[in-house]
């Protein structure tokens, strides 16, 4: 067996130490040790970076391969200490020479981080004498090609609450013959007691034997140079050489690409030139040189030289990288955000939520509880949970795994629930059997040599076979992510489902070979491709010829809750043509699904319009030469329409005679799924854009709280500049995908108080994975000038222009942001100039206008164009048809300039996936993938119809902005046709004839090509989102391919806190977003992530439960990492949020310490003040009245003592403490604060007492304790404080006001908790009470007394959580105590609960 020595280096940085809640003052020290699996022979060395010769007693040092940080002293609460120690661990590994890469990937690396403490200076002198008080072990998931680049805030245990920020960078730096001797792990004696170091040292292998394999015999000196090795030996040498060189080249490329990424994303880093080693070219050169050699010694020597040469380049780059990033604060911030986003996403798995009608809270939902129990068991044993990948650098104690993370079910009781769906958002969605590794998604590295914006590949997921790519193809994809997640406020506005009709269920992404693209003249592909059709036009004007044939597609859905709701009227496909128009084939791409939802609105602005007629769709020509106009009608429906069930109705064509109709054209074939998407009407009366197809209605709502709007206002203020930096100041809108709360900014974008920011903020917002996206000229002067000229250009647009003049295209401008609209009836070259398409490739969108509004920011004098309404609520009618996408020169959008240059015969570069990197600015050319689609069209050139729907309807919409470009567009397009820059394959879409639509149900899709002019626009901090969109069904937040966004870094002058979340560039097999920067290295998606995604989809299909997963939402509760670098100064003028924490029976003030900690960490700068109640900790066995008086006194004294200006008050209670809280609310002295109540978080509270406890053991124990302690509270909990049940304390308490004053009432319960009956903690009926004719009626009255006022309260939302902890088999678990206290001391439960959902209740 040949063996290879591989060298891996780990750079570990200790940044800051945070005293979260340490008990002891004194001297602390961090010690770091790298551990390698003992199964692999290895040698480890450690060193400290930048340490001088002289070192003091307290400075960092190395002791026995462990690095000791400098000693630091902790004296104060919340103290932060900068450690700033950097260390380097070098590991030499002996690897199997036949499978070096696999062997490297399998090595288990662990980083042990220990916290040592002493309060004695004397003890510090003894290195080994300082005791360790806490320890954490990080699993490092290193990949030889990508390395590892991650940052982890390591939190120590409950008794030593503190955090050390650790950054880790790792890379493969060398592969060579074994030059050092390795100690083999000993086999041990027959008793197995042998230690790891008992094995003999392995003798070194000669280079020739290593290179030529075991069958090689070194020739004797007599044979000399006449000896020729066998063919097998030569082949072995060449393969060995090729494999090692390839791995080193990939490692070099992976490190270089990551280096380029962070230089681009972090403006503060110095920009430098990095030497490029093209993988294929360099490898072929090295191999060809080797093949010219025959002498075995020279072959071996050359191989050794090549490996050393590559290793030297790799080491030089690695050194350069470390010099740049080590201890750099901005790099730390970047990695911190990345880790936090991934971690929150991972926690959101196995966290379900479901909505119910408010009245359902009073019903007995036994089936629901049983479903939860069964589902939790199914999940624990499902491949979905067991295949969940780890984080790139993980600590099981604080990150958990499938075996330790809790499963949580949330039930929300709201006025207008979203239900009627099972977890399978797209039930017909097929997860492909082809894994990404099989799909050859490799590309050439050269695309990043000249381009900063890295390529990204989209994995094709379709109902048919996934198209494959050529081995050398790049698929650079426009980012398509839905960040427009509408918040849904059940109080202010009923959940308004939005109609979006999506023709095209998936995004089928693949590429075409580059040789199929051409830049020379191809008149045959171009000559018939231009039609003089309106790109975005309403019904034709009187001066136009009209063919009244109309195809009417009626999409209907059923609604079991609100039958009055009117649904989508249909898609009118009108055929019209002008008198002199030739008949050309129009591309009507009609894939297999129509995803639609009905839309209701109870606001006055919607009712202003009796019907919505969206005819701003593209007109083209069908097979019979009749131009086709797609239009949508929507009549407003009744408010409060709960979602309809998923319907699969074919979009059958029916005759209809609106406007200009004669004969109906047949356009049947669409199997539809009608889905709902909730949205909210903002304060300004403008509705947020619905989630795109990639989002379920559940995903389209981030926060379902009455205070959502307040929360969002707060968030928007906090992230005002953040959004401005989403694009780093360039004019591309969809190149970034925000994470966390930022992902909901689309829905926030219409809030009135941010009008002044809209011009800068809105144009940065990305729309959705496949939905309308917004692009704007932003601050660029050229773009502004272009907009100013809009009126003039629109005048040139004559509806009866010449036959061969290119069609117009239009864009809607929202306060400076532009949505380029439909393009129909023209070839790819026609669209090439208008290539700044925010729209993701493969879809055609229908604008979602709600009616006309007199106010337009820019004049709407477009011929044949209808005015785009302003200040009108938009329902998301997105008709998505796969289409071509191209890039516009977005810096200036100067079509005349491009036209002039092209007319001079300057062909544009047809960029399939190439990016350009300049020293100080980054230009990005996004090339859409090209799909191989069946050429079933009869016309010579099939054009792509691209209907881009409008984005968020903001205060000012101007159709006119992009129309200004039309006249210039015409000239430039003609010039482009002369230049012949057309990719013919792209011009084929899946259908050219309406009559053939039935064949399209398989869902083939067209792709677009991005044509990039030679003068690529350069913009600072331009970049692409690398989110691998598996399909429409794969939400932007799907774990594997999450839209855990990749956003731009803060621009110069903006604080690093506003730095958006980066996408991860992590090794295969670890959890997270798949980075495209490494997409040129190998198959982009790891097998593990891919199988996890498949398992998740399978799980959602198999389990038919009406509910949703939080992981399918784009916005979760936490988007800001712990300890942000720049916390905003608290402005206490608005008052503070007082949070009162009340412990339970026999508890103390420290019981809710972790709860307080995670809220504080999750909401930095949240103006929170915690009162940890301690007045009752000495006697929790007293009666409730006594304890109520104590707590009330404590609260009022706290407010008066600190002279607090209270804006809101929230309560968190555990167990019996919840009863005390409810009792306080009834006291007259507290009446003044009732209007300030915000959230009541009840953790296992016995609100209905301890009646009907199913644990005899616990009931007996409580009875015994009550007797021994003579406890009044326990007596009252068991309803034995009065013979008349209706005079018992708990019954009388239920009759008093209380819960309805809160905005959020959150009840957390667990069936594993036997201390408090499950139904009592949830305040609901139980089966035993129903059968009990004596106590049961009283029990039911209590429930009605408690929940009745809550149901009637408009501003109150009830949320119940059902938690299934992963508990060990212990006595505590058996008696139910473990689950009872897990809500207090389980870091995994608390972090999962708060980071995913719970923090919303305290914002």
Swiss-Prot record:
Compositional bias per record (Basic and acidic residues), positions renumbered to this chain: 649-661
Keyword GTP-binding: no
Annotated region described as Disordered, given as residue ranges: 445-483, 514-548, 648-669, 718-740, 790-819
Annotated positions of the Phosphoserine modification: 775-776
Matches recorded under InterPro entries: AB_hydrolase_fold (IPR029058), DUF3657 (IPR022122), DUF676_lipase-like (IPR007751), Lipase-like (IPR044294)
Annotated SUPFAM superfamilies: alpha/beta-Hydrolases
Pfam families named among the record's database cross-references: DUF3657 (PF12394), DUF676 (PF05057)
Signal peptide segment: none
The family this protein is said to belong to: Belongs to the FAM135 family.
Protein name: Protein FAM135B
Gene name for this UniProt entry: Fam135b
